[in-house]
Each structure stands twice: as C-alpha cells, then as structure tokens.
Amino acid sequence: METRETKPVIFLFPFPLQGHLNPMFQLANIFFNRGFSITVIHTEFNSPNSSNFPHFTFVSIPDSLSEPESYPDVIEILHDLNSKCVAPFGDCLKKLISEEPTAACVIVDALWYFTHDLTEKFNFPRIVLRTVNLSAFVAFSKFHVLREKGYLSLQETKADSPVPELPYLRMKDLPWFQTEDPRSGDKLQIGVMKSLKSSSGIIFNAIEDLETDQLDEARIEFPVPLFCIGPFHRYVSASSSSLLAHDMTCLSWLDKQATNSVIYASLGSIASIDESEFLEIAWGLRNSNQPFLWVVRPGLIHGKEWIEILPKGFIENLEGRGKIVKWAPQPEVLAHRATGGFLTHCGWNSTLEGICEAIPMICRPSFGDQRVNARYINDVWKIGLHLENKVERLVIENAVRTLMTSSEGEEIRKRIMPMKETVEQCLKLGGSSFRNLENLIAYILSF
C-alpha cells in the first residue's frame, strides 16, 4: 500500500476567487482518487476551508493584500496578488520541492501569471489550469491581433459587427474586462498568454467533442500539450470549496415544486448590478408567474447589504411561489427534477453545469468569457436566450415564459439533450475526457 512518502505529489495553487477555487478543488479530488497526494498552496485572502478536505495538505502564504473594497476593480486585485505573492510563493514552492522526494509538478491557475519565471528557475514542471472553455480561450489568445486591428475600440460604436478572426462572435462579445485603466487589462492578457505558452501543459474543464474546431485552433497557437478532461464535477462528489455558506433549504423548497417548473436565477460570485436592474429582474421573475429560486449573494447590488430594497410585501405576496437565498448548492439545484430553466451570468462553470443537466438558459453576461459563452449558447448551440439589451422587467418576464412554457422553449430543450448525452459519453471508457485524463496522468508521471 502506497503512503504519502511514496505517492507522487502534486502541488496546486488556486486563484482565490470562487469561480476559480471550485474547478481547482474538483481537479484536486480527481487526482487524489487516482493515487496522487495533494498539497494546496493558498493565499490568506479568501483562504479555503481546509476542514472540508482532510485528505489534502494545506500550506498558507502571506499576500499582504489591502482591503478588497479599496481597489477600483477586480483586475487590480489580481495584479496586486501577482506582485505580492512572488516571494512568498517562491519560498514556499522551493521548500516543498526540497521536502517532497516524489514531487511531480505544480498546477497553477492561469491568473497566477508570475509563476512561470519561478518554475523555470527551479526547473520544475508547471501545468496551468485554464478555467474558460476552448472558444473563449481562442478568443483570448487573439488579443494582440484584435488590439492591433483596433477592434477593442469598436465594441461600442460597431457592437453588432462580426469579428472576422472569430466566427460567431460580434465586437461586443470580445472577452475583455472593463477596467479603470485599459493598460491594466492589456497587462493581464499579455501576462497570462506568456505564462501559458511557457508552461508544461494546459488543462481545461471542457469537452473536446463540443469544441473540436476550437481545440485544433488552440493547438496551432499553443505549442504545449492541451488536455480537455471536463466536466470536473462529474468525476467525484467533491467537498464544498464555497466561500459562502449554502442555503440548503432551497432543496426542500424545490421538492415541493412541479417537475421542470422552476426558473433558477444566479448571476455568479463576482459581478454586481445596480439597484434598478435588480428591481427589474425581481418584477420580471414575479410577473412571469413561474416558480423561481433566486440567488442574491450579499454584495450583488451596488451599495446594498442584501434585498432590503425590495418593495414591502414583495416576498409575502409571492405566497411561496418564489424563494430568494444568499447562496445555493448550484450543481444540486440544476440536477433537481423541479428545475426547468437557468437565468445565468454565463460563467463557464455555470454554463457547463447547465449543459450537464440539460437545463436551457437565459443569458445575462457581464464581462470576460461570459460574453463568448452567451453567444455560443444563443447562436451556435441554440440552447438558450440572450438578453442583449437593457434588462427590463417585461424582457425578463417574456424570456422566462418563452423558455418555460412556449414551443420555442420546448425546441431549445430538445437541442440541449444531445449535448448532455455527449458529455456523459465523454466520461465513459474510451470517451474523449476519459482518454485525455489517462494521457494527462501518464504525462505527469513521466516528469
């Protein structure tokens, strides 16, 4: 029987944002179940709950981060973390490598773009986890070309014009981040691309069979091994890596609802909306007359604690037809028989979880890869509806009714079923994700 001393050890360095923690810990569980020992290096900022993962070793590094509220946007937090973690991470990794005779590699989130210099210095394999799908990955990879051609400045004046280099996408879909200083976004793209191209390989929580053309294009651009082994959450029932407590009462509420009757609404863990949009969504959900489960995390609404701006009696007048929670166990909610639609920000984790359960989507993207995902959901895969203009209550109401009760919604539901079946096949013996995981494990053991 292998012990910690004889098992190959993988070090993991997740980026401390919810949408990045989840896939990294899912990946950690996959490797643990395949015989690897796992050591998680993490920042003090948004540090994970180690008690949820007693089978892993955790090592904390200082990040000296200021209060998150003091930063103008999340990109500045990202850059500051990359700057302040260089020395602590380097010291930590050097120590771990010297102490672990069976150390195999380190897997880092792509947003830790500073790590490539250190691992080259230590001559230690570094594999990168990219938490977007292949379509968004290819779009990000063309950043330098799109910048040179002036496309980024056309996102408002020619928003609906097609992007010749990226079939299906329009100027407004380009996955850039709105920042106080445009140079900050450029710095991020350049840093991430350089880090990816100098890595020992790239892992995707994606399905090769759904994006074969994009994978071929990515392989031309990136001369390193690429491994599509998603969906991560379907391999093992992982412990929670959520930074917020799940409100489990939503599952018992779903138990009382009719099959495929509930619209589930969640706009992710980072984006925020203004008071006006929040109220429009609230009235749109209410006026649709469909049962709804709505995740409103603290901080979702600019300047507000939670849902105190809802009109007096709003929740009471729903008479149990709607439920609002601060956070929910999303995979379980989407897998519930009562859930029939998903109003989503289109982050890739959420999009993939929706596809896995064949749940049609209403897309309300905010930034980054969410725009690419929304375009694919609406125009390429045709498995949802896209809210492209200002969010108004009538638009929300009509979208919910279309998705949940119309013949158009039924056609969408029929189109998403084969995608779910493709995902299920890819995980089986001989499937693309099964095969790619075997290749990835063999690759790591070859170092």
From Swiss-Prot:
InterPro entries: UDP_glucos_trans, UDP_glycos_trans_CS
Keywords: Glycosyltransferase, Plant defense, Transferase
Keyword Hydrolase attached: no
PROSITE patterns assigned to the protein according to its UniProt record, in alphabetical order: UDPGT
Enzyme Commission number: 2.4.1.-
Binding site for UDP-alpha-D-glucose: 269, 327-328, 345-353, 367-370
Superkingdom, natural source: Eukaryota
Gene Ontology terms describing biological process: defense response; leaf senescence; response to oomycetes
Tissue/organ expression: Expressed in roots, leaves, hydathodes, sepals and style.
Keyword Glycosyltransferase: yes
Disruption phenotype: Reduced rosette size, early leaf senescence, enhanced resistance to the biotrophic pathogen Pseudomonas syringae, increased susceptibility toward necrotrophic Alternaria brassicicola and constitutively elevated salicylic acid (SA) levels.
Induction behaviour: Induced by wounding and the bacterial pathogen Pseudomonas syringae pv. tomato (avirulent avrRpm1 strain).
An example molecular function term from Gene Ontology annotations: glucosyltransferase activity
Pfam families named in the record: UDPGT (PF00201)
Function: Glycosylates the amino acid-related molecules isoleucic acid (2-hydroxy-3-methylpentanoic acid) and valic acid (2-hydroxy-3-methylbutyric acid). Acts as a negative regulator of salicylic acid (SA)-dependent plant defense in the absence of pathogens and promotes the jasmonate (JA) response. Negatively influences the onset of senescence.
Family, per entry: Belongs to the UDP-glycosyltransferase family.
This protein's name: UDP-glycosyltransferase 76B1
Organism whose genome encodes this protein: Arabidopsis thaliana (Mouse-ear cress)
